[in-house]
């Protein structure tokens, strides 16, 4: 499988990216190198190798889910850099 500049142009349009002609050639080359590497991985003999979902033997690395009393609104608002009544006050982010 090979990637053409037409393919890269299509992908760039989907991603809303714009490339110069030099960048387009570079991206085409780099994508072809990646695909070539993946093709090499497909050639690896994995006969007799067990499939793995993880590389280590850890069974459960999560802590126990223990229920605690929730913080009061007052305690939570003590962490607020700025507040108004019972609410966090944050800078406007939408014009």
Curated annotation (Swiss-Prot):
Annotated keywords: ATP-binding, Ligase, Nucleotide-binding, Protein biosynthesis
Q: What is its EC number?
A: 6.3.5.-
One function term, GO molecular function aspect: asparaginyl-tRNA synthase (glutamine-hydrolyzing) activity
Which chemical reaction does it catalyze?
L-glutamyl-tRNA(Gln) + L-glutamine + ATP + H2O = L-glutaminyl-tRNA(Gln) + L-glutamate + ADP + phosphate + H(+); L-aspartyl-tRNA(Asn) + L-glutamine + ATP + H2O = L-asparaginyl-tRNA(Asn) + L-glutamate + ADP + phosphate + 2 H(+)
**One annotated GO biological process:** translation
The encoding gene is gatC
* Function according to Swiss-Prot or TrEMBL: Allows the formation of correctly charged Asn-tRNA(Asn) or Gln-tRNA(Gln) through the transamidation of misacylated Asp-tRNA(Asn) or Glu-tRNA(Gln) in organisms which lack either or both of asparaginyl-tRNA or glutaminyl-tRNA synthetases. The reaction takes place in the presence of glutamine and ATP through an activated phospho-Asp-tRNA(Asn) or phospho-Glu-tRNA(Gln).
| Disulfide bond sites | none
State the family it belongs to: Belongs to the GatC family.
Which protein, by its recorded name, is this? Aspartyl/glutamyl-tRNA(Asn/Gln) amidotransferase subunit C
């Amino acid at each position: 499988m090979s990637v053409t500049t037409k393919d890269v142009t299509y992908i760039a349009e989907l991603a809303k990216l714009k490339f110069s002609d030099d960048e387009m050639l570079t991206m085409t080359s780099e994508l072809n190198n990646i695909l070539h590497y993946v093709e090499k991985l497909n050639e690896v003999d994995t006969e007799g190798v067990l499939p793995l979902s993880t590389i280590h033997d850890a069974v459960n690395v999560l802590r126990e889910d223990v229920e605690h009393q929730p913080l009061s609104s007052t305690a939570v608002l003590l962490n607020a850099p700025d507040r108004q009544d019972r609410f966090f006050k944050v800078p406007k982010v939408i014009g």
